[in-house]
């Protein structure tokens, strides 16, 4: 019974997240950033209408009004959710030093055509996985049919 209740909550969170991301057909349109429905130290990057979960650096929480990770006193997040205590990842040399939310940076995965990276606001590569059967297409910056993505593993 506990497993069923957990599964229902997990599915409800996934549906909530999917409903929150607006459809994005224009690749030039800036990404939509949203608060995570249950974790204050996470946020959603809407990638062509699909929510991608990202984590704030340790000690910071998502500030939805500023659309960035912030100190807990400024973030005004719901109580009861503890911040991330993992050590902060190091910025990647592949990510630009200045974050521009209007121009997301996507990096193809080095060995897996079904994966890619998004550069977060702190210059860290966040690994993402395409839906089953699709490959990352760096020309259009979204998951695409393998014959169109032309990636060779």
UniProtKB/Swiss-Prot annotation:
Q: Which residues are glycosylated?
A: 63
Record's protein name: Peritrophin-1
Q: Which UniProt keywords apply?
A: Chitin-binding, Disulfide bond, Glycoprotein, Repeat, Signal
Q: What is the effect of changing residue 89 to S?
A: In strain: 4aRR, PEST
Q: Does the keyword Disulfide bond apply?
A: yes
Looking up Gene3D superfamilies in the UniProt record yields: Chitin binding domain (2.170.140.10)
| Position of the signal peptide | 1-17
The record's function comment reads:
Binds chitin but not cellulose. May be involved in the spatial organization of PM.
A single GO CC term, please? extracellular region
Residue ranges of domain Chitin-binding type-2 in the record = 18-79, 92-153
How this protein is processed and modified after translation, per its record? Glycosylated.
Regarding tissue, the record states:
Adult peritrophic membrane.
Spell out the InterPro entries in the cross-references.
Answer: Chitin-bd_dom, Chitin-bd_dom_sf, Chitin_bind-dev_reg
Q: A Pfam family matched by this chain, by name? A: CBM_14
- What does the record give as the organism's lineage? Eukaryota, Metazoa, Ecdysozoa, Arthropoda, Hexapoda
Annotated consequence of substituting residue 37 to S = In strain: L3-5
A GO molecular function term, named singly, is: chitin binding
Species source reads Anopheles gambiae (African malaria mosquito)
Where are the disulfide bridges? 56-69, 130-143
